[in-house]
Amino acid sequence: LMGGGMGMPRFEAAVVGNLELAWLIPLALIGTVCGWLYFVSEHTSEALAHAIGDRPVVKAMLAGLALAICGTVLPYTMFAGETQADVLMETYLTIPAGVLITTGLVKAMLTPALINLGWRGGHFFPVIFSGVSLGYGLAILTGADPVFCVAVCTASTMGAVMRQPVMVVGLLLMCFPL
């Protein structure tokens, strides 16, 4: 009933102790800031798209250039995130914490920019991936349970972006066990 599906990652149960509880609020605040960065990028890229006007080739080339630059420096920003979230589950310890955190923040800002410049797709999977990457990076820095960090960061990032808490809980039940 609540298994993974539709390309969504499925995480194991988190271990919650005193360390995790101490980090709950800071992690939620960081995830919320990630969601706010999404909106900063959305408003900025809307203004840019409006300034460019009805020139779809210019918009597509600018979006492609942004994606190419980000993808060269941070390869996990290249795709929507369904598959990359599963890869991060297995490999996050081999990636520096700063790279994971930066990837999460850049992905959150890159997604609305690409959409506003005419690229197709939605924000749902990229926002989940932003929270996952951010959470794994913060787990490395804090020593807290990785699944706990991922759950808090993903929930707070999605909550900030979607602004529909019941929907966020419902969607995240497909990724995280009760």
Report each predicted region and the residues it spans.
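Alpha-helical transmembrane segments and immediately membrane-proximal extracytoplasmic
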Residues: 1-178
